UniProtKB/Swiss-Prot annotation:
It comes from Schizosaccharomyces pombe (strain 972 / ATCC 24843) (Fission yeast). InterPro entries: UBQ-conjugat_E2_core (IPR000608), UBQ-conjugating_enzyme/RWD (IPR016135). Residues 5-139 form the UBC core domain. One of its GO terms (cellular component) is ubiquitin conjugating enzyme complex. PROSITE patterns: UBC_2. GO terms for biological process: postreplication repair; protein K63-linked ubiquitination. Belongs to the ubiquitin-conjugating enzyme family. This is Ubiquitin-conjugating enzyme spm2.
Length: 139
């Protein structure tokens, strides 16, 4: 099977994110519309229902370096969150602690990562963890 070039993959993701074609509880788009490298993205996750995250909107930054999609993106929460696998000081997501990042496959996408993080928020061991005040940020 032919390998889809990085920019084609990212342009597909940009179109999907801009048109809202994916899961409605997650969104993503370029940080700067003039970014011809398609490297820096903003994203949001709506907190899952029946958890301490319900009715919260979490902001994240995603960086796709030159190795994406062969390597996973670098994901950082802007909104403060108490979640295993997220550094409590910086908001950086530890790629060894989140399933889809740890077992990254080229066909995964930024949406895959956002949905996996949402799944972690809703898991029985995490859905009741005390959270920082709503609206607080890492930086």
């Amino acid at each position: 099977m032919a390998k889809v070039p990085r920019n084609f993959k990212l342009l597909e993701e940009l179109e999907k994110g801009e048109k809202g074609l994916g899961e409605s509880s997650c969104s993503y788009g370029l940080t700067n519309a003039d970014d011809i490298t398609l490297s820096d993205w903003n994203a949001t996750i709506l907190g899952p229902a029946h958890s301490v995250h319900e009715n919260r909107i979490y902001s994240l930054k995603i960086h796709c370096d030159a190795n994406y999609p062969d390597a996973p993106p670098i994901v950082t929460f802007v909104s403060r969150i108490n979640l295993p696998g997220v550094d409590g000081e910086t908001g950086k997501v530890n790629p060894h602690k989140i399933d889809c990042l740890r077992h990254w496959k080229r066909e995964y996408s930024m949406e895959t990562v956002l949905l996996d993080l949402k799944k972690e928020m809703a898991s029985s061991s995490n859905r009741k963890l005390p959270q920082p005040p709503e609206g607080s940020t890492f930086f």
